[in-house]
A protein has these predicted regions:
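A cross-family kinase active-site recognition segment
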Residues: 2-5, 148, 152-153
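Conserved non-catalytic scaffold segment of RNase H-like nuclease domains
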Residues: 11, 16-140, 144, 150-152, ...
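Short alpha-helix plus adjacent loop in nuclease-associated cores
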Residues: 156-173
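Generic recognition of well-ordered alpha-helical segments
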Residues: 161-164, 182, 206
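Short, glycine/charged-rich beta-strand-loop motifs at protein surfaces that mediate ligand recognition
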Residues: 165-170, 190-196
Length: 233
């Protein structure tokens, strides 16, 4: 049986397939070629806080992102936006881990107001996240609701990359791959705060440490294709 290709890879960008607006403008900017060296690559590290883990049933509450350009985290261009959930939807038990409250989100922006800013910052860039299916799923759900289509994205997942770096000869990893644990394995400090922007910055710093390790292993400059999931079949 032919193996399936991973979901978190490069998606084709045909602007005419998208409605006029932010999605078409994103698709109109070519994705970086797979042969782009990390030293010339632009990424956007993203983290989201949500009411739960299911993009089909749960809702965005906060998004934080920061560009990573030429191997540097651009903190001056970092952004964080709280998002107001739909009427009648409360934060619920999710407040115990992200500390966002219904009162605190009462004056937050609507998703339709935040999405254009995120999509504009993603133009020509690779989306970076730790356990990226969460971010990809919620961004897809939001753009489907707002624009009727999923955003075309090229995605690097630091959790998947950490699994590749830590797996033994049997493909097994001993220990946690959570963001804090992955950072600790690279000698990076633990952040006391837990919010979307802090976690986006933490993922960005983790990627740079992972790239440094990959360069040592490969004996050459790391390319975008070295960060993407391995395709088979």
């Amino acid at each position: 049986m032919r193996a399936r290709r991973p979901l978190l890879a490069r998606r084709p960008r045909r602007p005419d397939r998208y409605p006029p607006g932010p999605l078409r403008e994103l698709a109109a900017v070519p994705a970086p070629p797979a042969t782009t060296p990390v030293s010339r690559l632009e990424l956007l590290a993203l983290d989201v806080e949500t009411t739960g883990l299911d993009p089909r049933a749960d809702h965005l509450l906060s998004l934080g992102w920061v560009p990573v350009v030429g191997g540097r985290v651009r903190l001056a261009e970092a952004r964080e936006h709280r998002v107001r959930p739909p009427d009648g939807v409360g934060v619920g038990a999710s407040a115990t881990w992200h500390r966002l409250t219904d009162d605190g989100l009462s004056d937050a922006a609507a998703p339709a107001d935040v999405l254009p800013r995120l999509l504009a910052d993603l133009r020509g860039r690779v989306l970076l996240a730790h356990h990226a299916p969460i971010e990809v799923g919620f961004v897809a759900a939001a753009t489907l609701t707002a624009y009727g289509a999923r955003a075309p994205l090229t995605v690097v997942d630091t959790l998947a990359l950490e699994h590749r770096l830590r797996a033994d000869v049997n493909g097994e990893v001993h220990g946690s791959l959570r963001l804090d644990a992955a950072r600790r394995s690279h000698g990076l400090p633990r952040y006391a705060a837990h919010d979307a922007l802090t976690d986006a910055i933490a993922a960005a710093e983790l990627l740079l440490a992972q790239v440094a390790e990959l360069e040592q292993r490969l004996g050459r400059e790391v390319l975008l294709r070295d960060l993407l999931p391995t395709r088979s079949g």
